[in-house]
């Protein structure tokens, strides 16, 4: 069968047999490419190869590249689920030549694969070429035997590809498949080309020019090839279906969602199942590649995708959390081709659970507000864009969900008004932003780099060196000298000072010359390896070209080394304890402490934290040698070295290995092995001790631990011991019995608090020490009971109102509790026989307004609210009674 997995394998095997290096898909987050939000084409990982900035041992390559188009210029989100071929996630099959073969081989390889390997009928295929590309047209005739009418010349930019305003570019040749005359549409270049009969399945880009400017284009001395074929599209063709969502992969995912929800993918529910299947793929792959849902950047796009799928699950009537239950099905289909999915399965599931749980609350609130704001609208009307923006800005309800919810009613959103509101808010934010205060722009550092070269770093071998001053910067300007008392920056041709990078802070110390002493407070690495020593002249005057001695503060560096090495041990401990889904998301290494951020969907138990700490300290006690090696990156990865997600590494990397893998699991010799450019201890015993002092949440799916090492850890633990002894003295017990004594006191306190609350409720219900409003009154024919009480918890206040409802039988009960800090909490109850005419939510909001609150919520029979002005509790009850008078 031509399954998706078989088609992918056939493509890669075919090009491997034809001399191409089979490479793994690059991550969905482009490495060191700020121009792209997500990888959206196969050629993205080869940009620097095409432009000549990178060289590799191969000159032919083939990939199955995972791609996402859901933000920025390439945004298919709104169409997904409603068309046959729009996806947020897709796979791009490609073959690439880097100054090796060109048009003839590219055309031959494509034609041979389609007609011989995939056995497509020649009669079903036609091609386009750029209108003046006679060479490509001639080669198509020669290789395929296609007639002239099936080699269509296109004069538009659809058949000319450019990387950007400048850079490599060239004509394209697209291959189309004819689905037959039962489907409307004409061939490319015709009036009916927008129909669905003729579908592009493969694009061959012939990079033969370099665009130097808008007016100037020259021939490349060594042209290249970049091709791309959508796996989902070719799968539809080979499986004899016209719709991508009818291929085996999507049929399996949609069948699973139908089984779980119990609703078939027909009629109004057809698009929703397709949205869920597509968005599951993009969500899972983005999480596996290290993206976590958030309110900005890539994380926000992921959250939009996830929530759109969850919104459609809601439309299908899904009572339980859905998305995470589909993850095993997805991994069964795609895990073999993409093992990162398997490794991240638990993380993907937990993040989807967490996000869907949160979103259900947002959805319920947002849909209620949306329905309230759109009740007067009819089919063909426009929904107010300002209101849509308020839903987004205040309640976290994204625009695309508003559009989706209104689409079924035939109502559009005034997107222009939404955009204007968004721009207005951004302008206000910019006006209120004071900036970073950094007076030196990056261009200064690059200018220095061009003039004097990069700084040579000597700090791995020594903490003391000699050098020559190559640049001085004061107040953001390059100067020739700096004088006593002035704060400045010094650049030296070589330095033992480590410049802040990789989470490790910069070194401090002394730079001295014949006539000056400069105290270094910090060292930064700027503009392509220019090391900036930041500090103050303590004596004399420093000049450009002065010979200097540089001495690092070795005691401070020693503490930093211990903390940095500890992060490596903790990283491996976390992975062994929590799972292989743990990936470093950030770190901060200073002389005082270390901080380590990592992917994990939930808080860590005290037992897990103890195990993590114990594992790391076991390696410290080994006192094994820490090994530093320079290796080819492929060899390092093969040996098991962990690389930081999103970092771009050269062909040669620095590898730090720690600890003996005593269990000899697999082929891994070292306990911890990572790519790292930081400074480290010589033996693990130099770390002394590792103690975790906190574990917190940083963002959805990202946790943080903070830890101390060596003397700092010892002093911290001594302080903890001292506090335990002091507390034991206060409690008149021994340190060993402190926990038991505290538990006894807490139990006694809870018992007394319960007795006190019970007494307050009885007093309030019987009209005791509350004011006279505690009596039952009749207002406009309605029985009313209410009062003001002190320091009753909200849950007890509800119980008090329930008791009141039973006591009066029919009517309204309202109690307000005023806490010691002056805040007011109110609960209003309406007996069931009156809920058709009275709404507890409306009544409690009257109280809330008087108390200075923001409204309230609940059901028609019971609602609660609060406010900061508890002193107005009596006034609030009067306002409520006045409302009952009508």
UniProtKB/Swiss-Prot annotation:
Q: What is known of its domains?
A: Consists of three domains; the N-terminal catalytic domain, the editing domain and the C-terminal C-Ala domain. The editing domain removes incorrectly charged amino acids, while the C-Ala domain, along with tRNA(Ala), serves as a bridge to cooperatively bring together the editing and aminoacylation centers thus stimulating deacylation of misacylated tRNAs.
Q: What cofactor(s) does the depicted protein rely on? A: Zn(2+)
InterPro entries the record matches: aa-tRNA-synth_II/BPL/LPL, Ala-tRNA-lgiase_IIc, Ala-tRNA-ligase_IIc_anticod-bd, Ala-tRNA-synth_IIc_core, Ala-tRNA-synth_IIc_N, Ala-tRNA_ligase, Ala_tRNA_ligase_euk/bac, DHHA1_dom
The similarity comment for this entry is: Belongs to the class-II aminoacyl-tRNA synthetase family.
Give the originating organism: Bartonella bacilliformis (strain ATCC 35685 / KC583 / Herrer 020/F12,63)
Per its database record, what is this protein's job? Catalyzes the attachment of alanine to tRNA(Ala) in a two-step reaction: alanine is first activated by ATP to form Ala-AMP and then transferred to the acceptor end of tRNA(Ala). Also edits incorrectly charged Ser-tRNA(Ala) and Gly-tRNA(Ala) via its editing domain.
Specify the enzyme's EC class, one word.
ligase
Q: Where in the cell is it found?
A: Cytoplasm
Binding of Zn(2+) occurs at 564, 568, 676, 680
GO biological process per UniProt: alanyl-tRNA aminoacylation; negative regulation of DNA-templated transcription
Encoding gene (name):
alaS
Keyword Transmembrane helix belongs to the record: no
Taxonomic lineage per UniProt?
A: Bacteria, Pseudomonadati, Pseudomonadota, Alphaproteobacteria, Hyphomicrobiales
Cofactor, free-text remark: Binds 1 zinc ion per subunit.
Tell me the keywords, alphabetical order.
Aminoacyl-tRNA synthetase, ATP-binding, Cytoplasm, Ligase, Metal-binding, Nucleotide-binding, Protein biosynthesis, RNA-binding, tRNA-binding, Zinc
Write one Gene Ontology MF term.
ATP binding
Catalytic activity as recorded in UniProt: tRNA(Ala) + L-alanine + ATP = L-alanyl-tRNA(Ala) + AMP + diphosphate
Look up the EC number in the record and give it. 6.1.1.7
Put simply, this protein is called Alanine--tRNA ligase
Kindly name one Pfam family recorded for this protein. Answer: tRNA-synt_2c
UniProt xrefs under NCBIfam families: alaS
Q: What Gene3D superfamilies does this protein's entry cite? A: 2.40.30.130, 3.10.310.40, 3.30.54.20, 6.10.250.550, Bira Bifunctional Protein, Domain 2, Threonyl-trna Synthetase, Chain A, domain 2
């Amino acid at each position: 069968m031509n399954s998706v997995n078989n088609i992918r394998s056939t493509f890669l095997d075919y090009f491997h047999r034809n001399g191409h290096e089979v490479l793994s898909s690059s991550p969905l987050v482009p490495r060191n490419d700020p121009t792209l939000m997500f990888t959206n084409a196969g050629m993205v990982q080869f940009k620097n190869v095409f432009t000549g900035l990178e060289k590799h041992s191969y000159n032919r390559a083939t990939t199955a590249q995972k791609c996402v188009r859901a933000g920025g210029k390439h945004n298919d989100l709104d169409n997904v689920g409603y068309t046959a071929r729009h996806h947020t996630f897709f796979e791009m099959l490609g073959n690439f030549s880097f100054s090796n073969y060109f048009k003839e081989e590219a055309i031959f390889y494509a034609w041979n694969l389609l007609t011989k390997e995939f056995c497509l009928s020649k009669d079903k295929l036609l091609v386009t070429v750029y209108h003046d590309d006679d060479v490509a047209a001639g080669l198509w005739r020669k290789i395929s035997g296609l007639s002239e009418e099936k080699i269509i010349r296109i004069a538009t930019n659809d058949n000319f590809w450019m990387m950007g305003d400048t850079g490599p570019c060239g004509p394209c040749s697209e291959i189309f498949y004819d689905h037959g005359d039962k489907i409307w549409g004409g061939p490319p270049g015709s009036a009916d080309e927008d129909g669905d009969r003729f579908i592009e399945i493969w694009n061959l880009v012939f990079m033969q020019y370099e665009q130097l400017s808008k007016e100037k284009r020259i021939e490349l001395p060594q042209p290249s090839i970049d091709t791309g074929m959508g796996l989902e599209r070719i799968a539809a063709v080979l499986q004899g279906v016209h719709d991508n969502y009818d291929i085996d992969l999507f049929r399996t995912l949609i069948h699973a969602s139908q089984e779980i929800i119990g609703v078939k993918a027909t009629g109004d529910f057809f698009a929703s199942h397709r949205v869920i299947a597509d968005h599951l793929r993009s969500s899972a792959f983005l999480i596996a590649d290290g993206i976590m849902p958030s309110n900005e950047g890539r994380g926000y796009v992921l959250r939009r995708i996830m929530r759109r799928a969850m919104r459609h699950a809601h439309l299908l009537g899904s009572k339980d959390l859905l998305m995470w239950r589909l993850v095993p099905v997805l991994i069964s289909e795609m895990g073999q081709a993409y093992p990162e999915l398997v490794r991240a399965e638990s993380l993907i599931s937990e993040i989807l659970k967490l996000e869907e749980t949160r979103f259900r609350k947002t959805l319920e609130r947002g849909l209620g507000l949306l329905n309230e704001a759109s009740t007067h609208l009819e089919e063909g009307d426009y929904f107010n864009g300002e209101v849509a923006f308020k839903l987004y800005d205040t309640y976290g309800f994204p625009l695309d969900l508003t559009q989706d919810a209104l689409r079924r009613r035939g109502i559009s959103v005034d997107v222009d008004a939404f955009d204007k509101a968004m721009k207005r808010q951004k302008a206000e934010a910019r006006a209120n932003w004071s900036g970073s205060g950094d007076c030196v722009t990056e261009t200064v550092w690059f200018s220095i780099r061009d003039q004097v070269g990069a700084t040579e770093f000597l700090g791995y071998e020594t903490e003391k060196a000699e050098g020559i001053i190559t640049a001085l910067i004061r107040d953001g300007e390059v100067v020739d000298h700096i004088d006593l008392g002035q704060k400045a920056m010094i650049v030296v041709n070589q330095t033992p000072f480590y410049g802040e990078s990789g989470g490790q802070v910069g070194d401090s110390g002394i730079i001295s010359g014949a006539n000056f002493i400069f105290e270094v407070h910090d060292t930064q690495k700027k503009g392509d390896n220019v090391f900036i020593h930041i500090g103050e002249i303590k004596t004399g005057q420093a000049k450009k070209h002065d010979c200097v001695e540089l001495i690092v503060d070795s005691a401070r560096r020693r503490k930093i080394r211990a903390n940095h090495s500890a992060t490596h041990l903790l990283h491996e401990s976390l992975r062994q304890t929590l799972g292989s889904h743990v990936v470093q998301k950030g770190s901060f290494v200073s002389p005082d402490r270390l901080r380590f951020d990592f992917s994990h969907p939930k808080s860590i138990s005290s037992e897990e934290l103890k195990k993590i700490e114990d594992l790391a300290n076991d390696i410290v006690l080994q006192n094994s040698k820490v090994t530093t090696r320079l290796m080819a990156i492929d060899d390092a990865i093969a040996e098991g070295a962990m690389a930081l997600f999103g970092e771009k590494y050269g062909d040669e990397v620095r590898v730090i290995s720690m600890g003996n893998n005593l269990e000899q699991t697999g082929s891994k010799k070292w306990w911890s092995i990572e790519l790292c450019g930081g400074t480290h201890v010589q033996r693990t015993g130099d770390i002394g001790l590792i103690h975790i002092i906190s574990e917190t949440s940083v963002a959805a799916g990202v946790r943080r631990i903070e830890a101390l090492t060596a003397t700092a850890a010892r002093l911290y633990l001594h302080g903890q011991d001292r506090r335990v002894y002091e507390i034991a003295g206060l409690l008149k017990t021994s340190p060993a019995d402190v926990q038991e004594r505290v538990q006894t006191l807490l139990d006694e306190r809870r018992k007394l608090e319960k007795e006190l609350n019970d007494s307050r409720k009885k007093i309030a219900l019987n009209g005791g020490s509350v004011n006279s409003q505690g009596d039952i009154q009749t207002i406009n024919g309605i029985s009313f009971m209410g009062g003001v009480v002190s320091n009753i918890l909200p849950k007890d206040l509800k119980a008090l109102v329930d008791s009141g409802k039973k006591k009066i039988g029919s009517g309204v009960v309202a109690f307000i509790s005023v806490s010691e800090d002056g805040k007011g909490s109110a609960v209003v109850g309406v007996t069931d026989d009156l809920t058709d005419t009275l709404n507890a939510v409306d009544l409690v909001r009257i109280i809330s307004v008087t108390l200075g609150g923001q409204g309230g919520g609940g059901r028609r029979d019971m609602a609660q609210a609060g406010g900061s002005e508890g002193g107005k509790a009596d006034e609030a009850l009067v306002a409520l009674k006045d409302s009952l008078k009508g």
